[in-house]
Amino acid sequence: MKFFLIILILLNFLTTAPKANEVNIFSSRHYSSDIQLYEKFTSISGIKVNVVSGNDAALQKRIIEEGSDSEADLYITADAGRLGLFDQKGMFQNSISPKIKSIVPKSLRSDNWTGIAKRARIIFYSKDRIDKEVINNLRYEDLSDPKWNNKITVRQSNNIYNQSWIASIISNNGKENTDEWVKKFVKNFARDPKGNDRAQILAVAAGEADIAIANTYYYALMLSGQKGLEQQQAAKKVAPYFPNQSDRGTHMNISGGGILKYAPNPENALKLLEFLLTEEAQSHIVKNTFEYPIIDNVEPSEIIKSMGSFKQDLSTPVEDYARFQAVSLELMLRAGWK
């Protein structure tokens, strides 16, 4: 009898013992500055932050396979397309508190995940070979014009940033119009797509192309000197241009996160997500990653500010990037975009 009584006491203790005051992040972001930010959150809240880093494919595979046994509370990554596609697999829970809803524009979140920083995908052109007047009032749609034949460089069609960019064009112009546009756009490539965004800027600097499509933070990273003198000098040979200023504005994407379906610490995950949207956290993020803030009243880094202010496309829902991702890739491959 005493034995069974001891067992009952132990079971009661195990079921009522307080959970550890922690939150577990699975993140594909690769910034040491993010770790500094999590440490700041711990100092303020007392909640310990555990981080599992890796590439998106590996992290998502682990989360899915572990299911309800997963220790992951919060998934953080770059690109709304990635977040949306993972959401379609049913891996998030409602992550949007009234506080987040009041801070983040509806176009930069869903019910289950939210942006924590923005990035722009823009045109970089050769200062030596392209007159600024030729670039003025340029839209993404204009890049299909034959006058740009053999002048454009961009990375491969399997890149999620390109897929989300094309998805945004589908969202605004429809599938048929985008299909025709992509076919003409691909004909203007100066070379077969290869390399990352910085490789596209380097190609323009080297004279292999006149126009590159790349995210702004890659250019800022090069210009900062963090990638070496050669890349810094290359960045100085190109100039940024923000397209579509006469209509919807420049294509914007996000870094973001959402609370996972089986999160063991959802309350702590929400506290961290809300913290990442405070002025202090937003300022820390954009100063270290060269991204744009999600919230107002926060200035981007000096290098990003030097690129100038511009009209951002905040009307196209970033949810559409996952919604049209499959169609986007279909059109790109059909057009011969390698």
Over which residues does each language-model region extend?
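Short beta-strand->loop
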Residues: 26-29, 113, 125-128, 132-133, ...
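A structural signal for short loop-to-beta-strand junctions that line the ligand-binding cleft
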Residues: 70-75, 93-123, 141, 151-154
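Periplasmic-binding protein-like
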Residues: 150-157, 275-299
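Periplasmic solute-binding protein
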Residues: 80-91, 108-135, 167, 252-257
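Ligand-binding pocket segment of bilobal, Venus flytrap-like solute-binding proteins
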Residues: 168, 173-242
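A bilobed periplasmic-binding-protein/Venus flytrap-type ligand-binding module shared by bacterial periplasmic
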Residues: 124-129, 244, 252-265, 284-287
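An extracytoplasmic/periplasmic, membrane-proximal ligand-sensing/linker region
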Residues: 291-338
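Early extracytoplasmic/lumenal segment of secretory-pathway proteins
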Residues: 21-85, 338
